[in-house]
């Protein structure tokens, strides 16, 4: 089959003779219909030294076979989507960029009838990151699956800063935070203010304005008469961490969460980094670095993805904007170069397989 794998240190290529993966306990064999690209994909390629490791994390497809240890929720022929662990140096068969892939059943969804393969392919990394960042790290209450969604901020709503509000994780985070009763404040490019407002951000701020934007945020929360205690950073670089730390209120109970190992420089702010790959509950590797399984993250992931299934079925979560790339799997490597060069913004790059 076609697949995008590591062929030498820091280099990946499309091959045409990759064997189908061997089905494991708790996994589905899926015939891939669409894949979406993430920055983590090209970053993994750059640090991978061993040949034969499959890349890609976001996919949608059709169940071909069901492995042992899986409940009756999934059937052969089901349309499914979710998160797979591409670039895993501990398990080279895992990944999305192939015609047939393995997907751990606990953290996959049945695609709702109203959603296309291309739309569903955008969910995996973002949904997992939102769950870990907002609900494990920052301890937001889970959204309810009944009742009306809040339309406008109320006096009871607490502000929540989301830096990178127009990223794939950010646009999901805004929606989930709103469903949990928070008032999302989005930091992004002005080009995407309309997008994040449509999804539920109560205010938008230009990251390029630096200290001026920080002051605008502080003025906004002052008018809310609510302190800003929580910040989620989907960009997770030194400047974004500094921005979030400056924007948080001067209180002892503030919390900053990031997607990469970086900390807020304020000593009075708790910093937490989440790594989406721990959701699989298995030992894993990133390049030459090894990480142990985290059973609590796997258990959280099962509960989280079950909730997400309900919210998607109810049409209460929108997927990110998509751009369809050319040439299917053959075009993915060129797409990753576009992503690495910051040529794709405010949308998710998706390829049909």
From Swiss-Prot:
Record carries keyword Protein biosynthesis: no
SMART domains: PKS_ER
This protein's name: Trans-enoyl reductase rstn7
Family as reported in the entry's similarity comment: Belongs to the zinc-containing alcohol dehydrogenase family.
Pathway annotation: Antifungal biosynthesis
Assembly mode: Monomer.
EC number: 1.-.-.-
UniProt entry keywords in alphabetical sequence: NADP, Nucleotide-binding, Oxidoreductase
EC top class, as a word: oxidoreductase
Pfam families assigned: ADH_N
Binding, NADP(+): 207
MF terms in GO: nucleotide binding; oxidoreductase activity, acting on NAD(P)H
Function statement: Trans-enoyl reductase; part of the gene cluster that mediates the biosynthesis of the tetrahydropyranyl antifungal agent restricticin that acts as an inhibitor of CYP51 and blocks the ergosterol biosynthesis. The highly reducing polyketide synthase rstn3, the short chain dehydrogenase rstn4, the cyclase rstn5, the FAD-dependent monooxygenase rstn6 and the enoylreductase rstn7 are required to generate the first stable intermediate desmethylrestrictinol.
Organism (species): Aspergillus nomiae NRRL (strain ATCC 15546 / NRRL 13137 / CBS 260.88 / M93)
NADP is among the record's keywords: yes
């Amino acid at each position: 089959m076609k697949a995008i794998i590591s062929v030498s240190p820091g280099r990946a290529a499309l091959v045409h003779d990759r064997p189908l993966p061997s089905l494991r306990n708790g996994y589905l064999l899926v015939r891939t219909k669409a894949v979406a690209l993430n920055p983590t994909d090209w970053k993994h390629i750059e640090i991978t030294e061993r040949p034969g490791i499959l890349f890609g994390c976001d996919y949608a497809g059709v169940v071909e076979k069901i492995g042992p240890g899986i409940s009756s929720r999934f059937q052969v022929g089901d349309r499914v989507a979710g998160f797979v662990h591409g670039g895993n140096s501990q398990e080279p068969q895992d990944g999305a960029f192939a015609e047939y892939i393995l997907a751990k059943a606990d953290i996959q969804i049945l695609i709702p009838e109203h959603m296309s393969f291309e739309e569903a392919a955008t969910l995996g990394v973002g949904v997992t990151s939102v769950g870990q960042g907002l609900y494990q790290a920052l301890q937001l209450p889970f959204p309810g699956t009944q009742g009306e969604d809040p339309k406008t901020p109320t006096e009871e709503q607490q502000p929540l800063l989301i830096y990178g509000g127009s990223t794939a994780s950010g646009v999901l985070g805004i929606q989930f935070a709103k469903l949990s009763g928070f008032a999302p404040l989005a930091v992004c490019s002005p080009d995407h203010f309309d997008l994040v407002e449509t999804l539920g951000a109560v205010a938008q701020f230009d990251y390029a304005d630096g200290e001026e934007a920080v002051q605008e945020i502080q003025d906004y929360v002052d008018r809310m008469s609510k302190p800003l205690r929580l910040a989620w950073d989907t960009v997770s670089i030194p400047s974004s961490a500094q921005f979030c730390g400056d924007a948080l209120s001067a209180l002892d109970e503030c919390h900053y969460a990031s997607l990469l190992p970086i900390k807020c420089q304020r000593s009075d702010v708790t910093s937490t980094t989440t790594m989406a790959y721990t959701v699989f509950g298995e030992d894993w590797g990133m390049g030459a670095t090894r990480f142990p399984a985290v059973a609590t993250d796997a258990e959280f992931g099962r509960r989280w993805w079950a909730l997400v299934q309900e919210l998607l079925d109810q049409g209460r979560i929108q997927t990110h904007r998509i751009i369809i790339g050319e040439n299917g799997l053959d075009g993915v490597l060129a797409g990753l170069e576009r992503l690495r060069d910051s040529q794709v913004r405010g949308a998710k790059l998706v390829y049909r397989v």
